[in-house]
Every structure is written in structure tokens, then in C-alpha cells.
């Protein structure tokens, strides 16, 4: 954590380099070192999944991840539904999930956070995935943001329920014409803010 005794911006009269012009002045070194350690080295991660995930009707099911874009002090755990933290602090959690529904009836889906295997109160979000229209599956994207405190060794998971058992978490492959990148079924980002 911050040590206010050596992270204050040095006074204007303190030169950036020593008198010989060879080394950074100690006050400035402390400032930049602590700035890096506090702001640049904070834990973060961007995780996603490129498969199709299904669940049995009304059965809480863990959402899994098989890839990451970048991480710092966070990782995909075992099982692959766990996002594990190596440092402590208040973290912002954002997830985006792409649901599709191939059935002839609308389907309600619920998603919530679990921390260390325990459901986090008041984190469930609901969305209705529309029914198939013609030959096109119904689809909807759910995006949610939370703040939660984590410590070293803590982990988070996303759980979901599909009421009818019809909805899926679906990855859409890349396309050449029209050109567009692939769209992962689920994307989760975590960033420590304090």
C-alpha cells in the first residue's frame, strides 16, 4: 500500500538527477518507483471463452474461460471457471455474455457472482433471450459491472441458470464477407482500482 512518507511529489527545488547528472535523485526515484508499484502494477485481467456453453434447465452452472488477452496478478484457475487473484484490493468486474436461443419460446437467464465458492448477495442479473424468429436464433447480450474486494488466493466465478434449458452462451466465428472478428461468448475483465 502507499507509504505517504515517500510517495509525495518532491519539491520543485529537488533536481531530478544528482549533481553529477548520472543518477536519479533519491526523492524522485522513490516517487516514480512507488507510482509504478501502486498504479502501473495493479492487478488486472481480460478473460474470454471461445466455445458454446450450455446448461440444464434451472441448474446453476459455472461459466468457464479458455483464453485471456492480458493479465497481471490474475489468472484462470482450476477448474477453468475460477479467476484467481494474487493481490488484494477493491476490484471492478465487468462481464459481457452473448446468449442465443434456438427454441420457439422466450427463455429467461440469470447470471451472478460467486466469491470463493459463495454466492455474492444482490449480484444476480436477469435477461430474457428472445425466441427463434424464422431461421435465426434469438439473441441478446448481457453486460454487467460490479465492485468487489479480493485478496491473494481469492477467486471469482460467474454462474448462470437458463429457466427453460434452451439458451446457450454462444461464440460467433469471424467472418470474411462482411469482414468482422470473432465474438467470444463471454468476456470478463477485472481491474483493481484501490
Please give the residue ranges for each predicted region:
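Long, low-complexity or tandemly repetitive, helically biased scaffold regions used
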Residues: 8-12
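Extracellular jelly-roll beta-sandwich "head" domains, especially the C-terminal globular C1q domain
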Residues: 2-5, 18-194
Amino acid at each position: 500500500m502507499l507509504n505517504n512518507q515517500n510517495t509525495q511529489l518532491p519539491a520543485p527545488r529537488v533536481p531530478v538527477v544528482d549533481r553529477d547528472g548520472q543518477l536519479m535523485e533519491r526523492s524522485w526515484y522513490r516517487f516514480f518507483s512507488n507510482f509504478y508499484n501502486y498504479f502501473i502494477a495493479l492487478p488486472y485481467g481480460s478473460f474470454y471463452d471461445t466455445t458454446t456453453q450450455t446448461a440444464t434447465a434451472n441448474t446453476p452452472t459455472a461459466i468457464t474461460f479458455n483464453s485471456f488477452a492480458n493479465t497481471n496478478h490474475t489468472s484462470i484457475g482450476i477448474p477453468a471457471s475460477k479467476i484467481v487473484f494474487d493481490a488484494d484490493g477493491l476490484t471492478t468486474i465487468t462481464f459481457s455474455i452473448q446468449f442465443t436461443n434456438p427454441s420457439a419460446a422466450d427463455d429467461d437467464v440469470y447470471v451472478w457472482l460467486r466469491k470463493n465458492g459463495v454466492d455474492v448477495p444482490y449480484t444476480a442479473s436477469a435477461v430474457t433471450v428472445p425466441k427463434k424468429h424464422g431461421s435465426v436464433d434469438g439473441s441478446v447480450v448481457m453486460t454487467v459491472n460490479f465492485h468487489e474486494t479480493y485478496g491473494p488466493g481469492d477467486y471469482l466465478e460467474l454462474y448462470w441458470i437458463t429457466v427453460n434449458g434452451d439458451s446457450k452462451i454462444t461464440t460467433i466465428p469471424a467472418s470474411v464477407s462482411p469482414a468482422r472478428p470473432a465474438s467470444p461468448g463471454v468476456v470478463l475483465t477485472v481491474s483493481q482500482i484501490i
